[in-house]
Amino acid sequence: MSSGAASGTGRGRPRGGGPGPGDPPPSETHKLVVVGGGGVGKSALTIQFIQSYFVSDYDPTIEDSYTKICSVDGIPARLDILDTAGQEEFGAMREQYMRAGHGFLLVFAINDRQSFNEVGKLFTQILRVKDRDDFPVVLVGNKADLESQRQVPRSEASAFGASHHVAYFEASAKLRLNVDEAFEQLVRAVRKYQEQELPPSPPSAPRKKGGGCPCVLL
């Protein structure tokens, strides 16, 4: 479970405070990027996770950044979260933030078929920019509170996640459903990936017993 302090740079949005005096210092920093098509609720998910606040009316995001210090699986972590633009006119910015990200929350809306089609393209772009066959990604079907308007079957989204080896969550920023869980799973995926990417430690040189010149007894 996540807990901790948060702050944000989004314009006209509530801000959190810094870490309290009793909070343990974070032992790691992760750069997380929230990506997806326009209007899928990326900002709503991010702000709900950062500040436990649902924003229903705001201008389309160009790019906002937030910081949250929290504990995931008992390990303090600083999360630098970039909430990105979904509008096509800002597409040129994508590769820049993709290069910097340690992990990606890939978001579509369950009531928007086109947004689901878009995540496949974004996933492919992430792997191309990173020049990897896999990378830490969590797939999120947002707006689960709009079940009656669903256009993307849960089974189809789950199959996408399974075939690409990424976790899938159906979430609702409005109801705060699976919001923390999705971000926490992304942190776990980043940790696992980084552990696998670390070069093996060089073997330590064997210690010689004794020292100095050999003694000769006369």
Swiss-Prot record:
- The UniProt annotation puts motif Effector region at 58-66
GO MF annotation list? GDP binding; GTP binding; GTPase activity; protein-containing complex binding
Listed result of changing residue 38 to V? No effect on interaction with OSBPL3
Q: Where is the composition biased (Gly residues)?
A: 7-20
Which UniProt keywords are given for this protein, alphabetically ordered? Cell membrane, GTP-binding, Hydrolase, Lipoprotein, Membrane, Methylation, Nucleotide-binding, Palmitate, Prenylation
Give the similarity note.
Belongs to the small GTPase superfamily. Ras family.
Q: What is this protein called?
A: Ras-related protein R-Ras
Identify the species of origin. Answer: Homo sapiens (Human)
Organism lineage = Eukaryota, Metazoa, Chordata, Craniata, Vertebrata
Gene encoding this polypeptide?
Answer: RRAS
